[in-house]
Amino acid sequence: MTAHPEFAVIGAGAWGTALASLYAAQGRRVALVARDSTKAAALATTRTTPRLPGLRLPDSLAVTARPPEAPVTLLAVPFQHLRETLGRLPQGNGTLVLCAKGVERESGALGPEIAAEMEPRRPCAVLTGPNFAHEIAIGLPAAAVLAMTDDGARRDLVQHLATPRLRVYGSADPIGAALGGAAKNVIAIAAGAVIGAGLGENARAALITRGLAEIARLTEALGGAAETISGLAGLGDLILTATGSASRNYRAGLAFGQGKRPDTEAGVIEGIATAPALLARARATGCEMPVTEAVTDLLAGRITLEASMNRLLRRALRDER
């Protein structure tokens, strides 16, 4: 690279490649960082990836295996590799933007909590929302939310990340934004499972709505704002992920509902690792998450789908909240 990039995008999967292509196509200096030199060389040569069929990487997009210094580094690696990836970044004071969605399996930590531990001196933001990678990559219109506690830095970064086809809203609640993006994957598995088992659209709508309520409860318990979950980071992302056929978590649920194993070759299914970690975090705060508990037990083989649905339906009746 002859000049330092404006953006370094760590992770050359579908989401990282889509973001890198989006910003490179806008004339930004962008470096896409693959996990090893072999993959980087292949991407640099072919300018294509099987993760995003039909997309050709912009000629200006640099591809490398070594993370460069950059004013803004977007981390789009599978969530369970976030801590390791942060440990390999070059020293610097550039802003970190967390683009992966999940909860750390071992600790139950959210992305902003991991970043605060690993890189306490760096500004950190969460970029999330209802965004399928393939649609972003080809420039279809979309909206996202950029969550960061520093008001001035957030306003500047929103301007930096918005494009004519991606509208970016600001939020001062990175915990709520991160939790909404992580937990919706679990609820999407539940939604897919009931459709796969032929239990109907009513059941899916009920699970999505009650799943949203339990995400909001945990958000408040962790110090976030419940209203964050009614926006793009929560409701918007949940609607897309729990109904869209391109959602890996929804498709995993469909497979479970049909008595099959999910296809893990198409990409990481974050909700599978997130469910038990999220449930443990909820229990530690005394927060009830019955849908998440049902998904966790279903994934572990401790309960059948029919039994889990009966357990949810037979909970004590009460006012909705």
From Swiss-Prot:
NADPH binds at residues 15, 35, 101, 133, 248, 268, 270. The active site is at 184 (proton acceptor). It is an enzyme of class 1 (oxidoreductase). One of its GO terms (biological process) is phospholipid biosynthetic process. It catalyses: sn-glycerol 3-phosphate + NAD(+) = dihydroxyacetone phosphate + NADH + H(+); sn-glycerol 3-phosphate + NADP(+) = dihydroxyacetone phosphate + NADPH + H(+). InterPro entries: 6-PGluconate_DH-like_C_sf, 6PGD_dom2, G3P_DH_NAD-dep, G3P_DH_NAD-dep_C, G3P_DH_NAD-dep_N, NAD(P)-bd_dom_sf. Keywords: Cytoplasm, Lipid biosynthesis, Lipid metabolism, NAD, NADP, Nucleotide-binding, Oxidoreductase, Phospholipid biosynthesis, Phospholipid metabolism. The keyword Lyase does not apply. It comes from the Bacteria. Pathway: Membrane lipid metabolism; glycerophospholipid metabolism. The keyword Cytoplasm applies. Catalyzes the reduction of the glycolytic intermediate dihydroxyacetone phosphate (DHAP) to sn-glycerol 3-phosphate (G3P), the key precursor for phospholipid synthesis. Belongs to the NAD-dependent glycerol-3-phosphate dehydrogenase family. This is Glycerol-3-phosphate dehydrogenase [NAD(P)+]. It comes from Acidiphilium cryptum (strain JF-5).
